[in-house]
Amino acid sequence: IITTVALKVAGMSWFMAMNLALASVATGGFSYQYESLMEFETVYVEMIVIIAMVAASLNFALYYKIYQHNFKVFWIDTERKAYFWIIGIATFLITWNLYYTGYFDAATSFRHALFQTVSIASTTGFASSDFNLWPDFSRYVLLLLMFVGGCSGSTAGGMKVSRFVILLKVTWAELRRTIHPRLVYSIKMGGRNVPPVVVGNVTRLSLIHISEPTRR
């Protein structure tokens, strides 16, 4: 409802606003416009959709904690912080690449980089620009975002950020163990130890998720 009203205030019709709001919150990316959000060419609509996509791709359990006035859990949540870092780093890299190659000016590069990063990371799929024509580096970054996806417990797809974080921690721990063979390590998420069984399952599932497109 909030997203629909905000889009209406931004100048859209009620039907278009409701259609876009439902697709954004569901991270479905459905749009009856042939060119997706490229048809609107307005920063206000893009910013509203970005906020909706980010909100929908976070763990919904965090909102329940906020409802209980437990704001600390939201701020210290490892997955949320990792997700925001991923969005920030990817946006910076794509902005730099688009500007450096002369594809857009600085402001426009940041605008489209942020929108496409959030759209792909949340597995929504909206487009504010035809990123298929972007430089190869930017498209590779978007491809990696597609694999990682959004947070667990959200409407987003992908491997999930929590599994990606665990996979990175396991990789780092194994690299350290090559230097210190007797090293005993434990994987932690949110200050709690992740059971070895869960770590093993996450590792196997992540490898299957990554290798499946290649096998096809």
Regions found by a protein language model. Give the residues of each.
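Membrane-proximal intracellular helices of multi-pass ion channels
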Residues: I1-R216
